[in-house]
Amino acid sequence: MPESSTPSLLIPNFPPRAAAVHRVTKETDVRVSLNLMGSGLCHVATGVPFLDHMLHQIASHGLIDLEVNATGDIEIDDHHTNEDVGITLGQALAEALGDRRGINRFGHFIAPLDEALVQVTLDFSGRPHLSYGLQIPTERVGTYDTQLVREFFVAVVNHSQMTLHIRQLDGINSHHIIEATFKAFARAMRMAIEVDPRRADTIPSSKGVL
């Protein structure tokens, strides 16, 4: 079960639109701290090097300050750590966004990386849904199981309550496809979480609630 975490070294004084979540199971121990109004500061240590690299993309291109520390049963494989980092990140996003008052809510970006081109569209709708359209040609990038990309986004979507559509428009290199996906996700999320000055203090829904 998640619990509030102590302030991190990266984000010592928690401003509005920031959160810290600590999640412990028999398989993993994960701490995530983030500031949605950050500048891209990042410190991650999950024990899964390729996942660390992708989390850096989220922070850098999403302009969020992000700290992730995780230990898990990676002697078995990376699945539990990968999924639980996604769960905890999703929970931290939901906590930092609160009732989502004043945000754009929707975000969209198409990111190239050499021959790869990936489109991401998302909506902080309060209704979790993932439409996943990557065709990653290899089973692994280094030691990272490429099936875990989808599992990571399933976890983030379900626990942040977002709708997320990922489409691969081009690409043959597995690393490029995955990295373009994380970059596009970061930029789309940056657009969605920005405060719309015209919306002021209202919730971005015709229903009045998300």
From Swiss-Prot:
Its EC number is 4.2.1.19. It catalyses: D-erythro-1-(imidazol-4-yl)glycerol 3-phosphate = 3-(imidazol-4-yl)-2-oxopropyl phosphate + H2O. Transmembrane segments: none annotated. One of its GO terms (cellular component) is cytoplasm. It is found in: Cytoplasm. Pathway: Amino-acid biosynthesis; L-histidine biosynthesis; L-histidine from 5-phospho-alpha-D-ribose 1-diphosphate: step 6/9. The keyword Amino-acid biosynthesis applies. This is Imidazoleglycerol-phosphate dehydratase. It comes from Synechocystis sp. (strain ATCC 27184 / PCC 6803 / Kazusa). The lineage of its organism: Bacteria, Bacillati, Cyanobacteriota, Cyanophyceae, Synechococcales.
